[in-house]
C-alpha cells in the first residue's frame, strides 16, 4: 500500500506521479495535510487562504464524484505519516516537491520519517514546464541563466522540442482506500476550517478551471497582447489562481495555448516562461529567499507602509489598485509592479513588508512568484529592474488607462474628475514623486554598492 500526499496539486488529472502510482498496482491512501505553519485561522480569513480552501473543496468534490477517498487533516505531515505507518501496511510514500525553504524542510522531514519507518519514497517536481537540470544540459550551461531574454529564447527551443504532454493517468485509474475514523480524529480540522470548507462547497463547479481556460483562449487571447497591460479592459487570463494551487496542470495550460493557430498565443506563452524563470531562479539562485538578510536596510523605514496598505497615499492609481486588492484579492500584473515599486522605491520601505502583505491579500498567491515580483521591483535578484528605474505611477496611469476607467471603478469619489485630472497626485499625497525618485536612486545605488 502507498500513501499519496497532495500538495500544490489540487486536482485529479494530469498528475506526474499518478503514472508511477498506477504502475505500482497497489491500493493507496490519498491525503491532504493542511499545515498550521502555512494555513492558520488568520490566513484562512484572507483572500489567499479563502481561495486555497476553495480549491480544496473542489478537490473534495472531484474525489466524491469519482467514488474515491480523500482524507483531509490538519497537522504536521511527518506526524500524520507516523500514525498511518503504525496502522496500515504502507510500503511507499509519494508526493510532489516544492521549492520554498519551509517546503524543503518539511519535505526532508517527511522523507526522513519515511525512511525511519522503512518506507520507499517517490517524489518529483510537477509545477514547472521545464525540468531545470535537463534544461541546463540542453542549453549546455554550467552557470544558470540570469537574464530572462536568453533564458526565454532557449526555453522556447526546449518547449518546441521536448514539451511534456499532459499525463494520461487520472484518479479513476487508481484504487484509493478509506482510512479508519481514528486517523482523521487524531488530526481533525479546527471548527473554523471545517466551516470555511463547507461554506465554499455549494457554488463550486468541479470543471471550473478548464472552463475558465477555454473561455480565455476563445474570448480574450486575441486581444491579450494589446490588452494585458490595459488593466481597465480586464483582458487578463485570470488563470493564475488555478495554476498556482495546481487546480489545473501547467502542462494542460501550455498545450492548449500552444495549439491555438491564430498567432495570438506568443504573448501569453511568454508569461508562462516568466513563471518558469522565477521558479528556475528559486532553484538556482542561492540568495533567492535570503535577500532581506544580505543588505543593510537601516536607510529604509516603514513609516508610510500603512498609508500604502490602506489605500491612503493620495496617488490615485496606487490607492485604486490597493483598494481592489483589499476588497477582492485581485490586482492586474502591471499594477502589482507599479504598487510594489512605489512602496520600495518612492516610499523606501523594505520589500519584504510588501511581500508579506501580498502573501495574505492575493487570492492567487504563490510564494516563489510573489517574491520574484518584489525582488524585481526592488532591483534585487536575476534580471531585476535597474536601481535607477523608478516607475512614475501617474505616468503609468496615464499611459495604460488614459480615460481613468480603473480609478473611477475603485475610487468612485474621484469619478467626477476629468480624464487628465483623475491621474494626478491629490492634495493629500504623502510623497512628492519627483523628490522621491531622486531619493530612491540615491538610496538604492548606495544599497547595492554595499553588497558588491
Question: Which positions does each model-derived feature cover?
Answer:
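Alpha-helical structural signal in soluble globular domains
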Residues: 62, 109, 113-117, 357, ...
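N-terminal beta-strand-loop-alpha-helix module at the start
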Residues: 1-68, 436-445, 451
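Glycine/tryptophan-enriched, flexible segments
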Residues: 119, 142-293, 400-401, 405-452
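Short beta->alpha junction loops
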Residues: 68-78, 309
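Residues at alpha-helix caps and immediate loop-helix transition turns in enzyme cores, especially N-
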Residues: 13-17, 106-107, 354
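Beta-rich, aromatic/charged-enriched effector core domains that present basic-aromatic interfaces
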Residues: 77-204, 374-377, 394
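Active-site-proximal binding-pocket segments
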Residues: 234-413
